[in-house]
């Protein structure tokens, strides 16, 4: 008779029922007082103990504890896939302007509609995942996400290209919103901050790699074939996530529309959710506005950078990826409100430095700006996950709706500013957005956090 081998014994949540775990999943339950011999079809007994499997015999479940490096890597990989295609065209905007004979506003809209699609779909994706499950939504979104990327290589006009970029954005929340809800359900609060840091690092790396790869590949083989290669890379990512992402263990389907509407009404009266959404709006406003139009500035005199050199500018994202895990330490030491305020102030300093003429100073300004934004985003997401217990995926969806709408507004308003006043106008617009974000932190978020007040 085979009993459970290589299992780690723990107490149950109630502290009375001993459980044995395998790969972080409860594998069997030990019951006392059973008679010798078979105790039934579902469990076997020996020496007064019965071992009842909690998983069907022969079922292989890919599951990892939150401390597993492989699971953290999977979380970061999904974040990278989500943002690899979203901003990739920023590195070739000057080329696209020439190819489609578009002006600054039209090309800015091609960037902005992607994040607009993300914002519009975020709340609805939250409702759908509440009904159908997190893992299914994540894998489906990655698959469909690769299709409009491939089709955009054949777009004949700037209008059709912009429409396809909008469709790219439609599928991104299926990865971002559902993954955050998945983590919030599957793990305890002490693990969420570290997992969120890995997720944000993944999004940072994905944002960098999409721009970097498209810029360099375009220099070698042209932008159309480069888009096809990036689409194939996303499809490969779909297969890897389908294989590696563990099934949900604590998900309970809640398909009722009435439940979702009650959660929506509750969130719309929740100062924590509303203030986080408002802050998220101005965070992505700044990031998209800055990195969409810094390339137009650097493609002009006196820099005249080509597409590969412009792609290299986004290496500042790698520095942000290295520094962003510090958000976990900052959150533990200072709390979310102080972390948000410090990181947003750092971003303001970076924007001001970007006005300098030497390319190295511009580069340093972009490092400070992006690092501040990444830490603010990580702190805000953790703030929502820790303070919202009911309708978490819908709350996350509302946050991302505001976050991505901010990116759309940033692309449009900064395009108008660049068209009228060049980079100085963009900097003025970004500083206004950052100052409003600081006002939200000190006037609302600070007041709702006892730790910040203390």
Regions found by a protein language model. Name each.
Residues 337-380:
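C-terminal transmembrane helical hairpin of 12-TM major facilitator-type secondary transporters
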Residues 148, 159-167, 360-368:
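Paired small-residue
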Residues 122-133, 323-335, 418:
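Helix-to-loop junctions at the C-terminal end of transmembrane segments
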Residues 189, 198-245:
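Helix-loop-helix hairpin linking two adjacent transmembrane segments in secondary transporters
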